[in-house]
Amino acid sequence: MKVLFDTNVLVYDTIENSPHHDSASELVDKSADPMINSLSIVELGFVLPRYGIDNESVRMKIDELLHSDYFTVSWLSGKMMEKASTFVVENKLSFRDFNDWIIAYDAYSRKVPLATFDRVLHNKCKKLGIQVIEI
């Protein structure tokens, strides 16, 4: 099944002592057609160092995702940002979470489920009719 992963799934998959590592790794490994938004690659660049990951390891992870034969990268475009911002306004959402809504909107527009460990985002997506995977 095609699925778009939120950044937190990639973070937990990467960090072996993270609370959801096993679940994230299993989800990533079992996905037949996994997708990531390029914004998630950017977010990994500033999230992973917060967990003590050194710069070289972060660079290697970014390179791995950019050149992956496993993940399909959905490249963030101006058009996607315009549509996501309209989606935020129309649904009275907060731009404080614009990064999350860009990724969620990407899944919504492609009609693929979003996989996220963010319970608040998960619940809001369900209310808005965005498919989410129960993790």
Segments (PLM) and residue ranges:
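Aromatic- and histidine-enriched alpha-helix N-cap/loop-to-helix transition segments
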Residues: 36-39, 102
